[in-house]
Amino acid sequence: MKIKLANIYVDDLDKALHFYTQVAGFVKKTDVSQGGYRWLTVASPEEPDGTELHLERNDNPAAKAYQQALFEQGQPAAMFYTDDVKRDYERMKDAAEFKMPPTKVTGSTIAQANDTCGNLIQITQLDRVRT
C-alpha cells in the first residue's frame, strides 16, 4: 500500500494552481472539469508519477472551518520536504508571503509560507536522512 493522493482545501483553484506551480515549483498533473466540478492535482517535478496534491475547493462548510482554524492557529495544512530549505526560500520569497523564514528546530530547518488560498505550508529540511 502507498499514498498516492493528498488533499489541500483552497478558496480559489486558479490562484492555487498559480501558487503551487509558478511559486512552489510543482507541475500540473491533472486538470479535468465536468459539470461545474474541477479535479486539479499537482506533483513534484522530481517525481511526476509519485504522490499528487489535490487542490480542492473549500465549498464544504466543515472543510472551510477546518482550513480557517488551522490557518488562525499557525498550523501548516501541508508539509513539503526539500534538501535545501534556504535555497527554496530564496527562490520563493519574492512571490510568497513567508510567515516564518528558515528556522532551525529540533531535527530540521523549516520555513512557513501563506499559499494565498487560505493555508500555511511548511517546507522542511531534515538534519539527517531517515532510514
Feature-to-residue mapping (PLM):
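Conserved active-site tyrosine of GNAT-family acetyltransferases
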Residues: 16-21, 92, 118
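Vicinal oxygen chelate
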Residues: 1-5, 27-80, 89-116, 124-131
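Conserved catalytic-loop position in the HRD/HxD motif
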Residues: 84
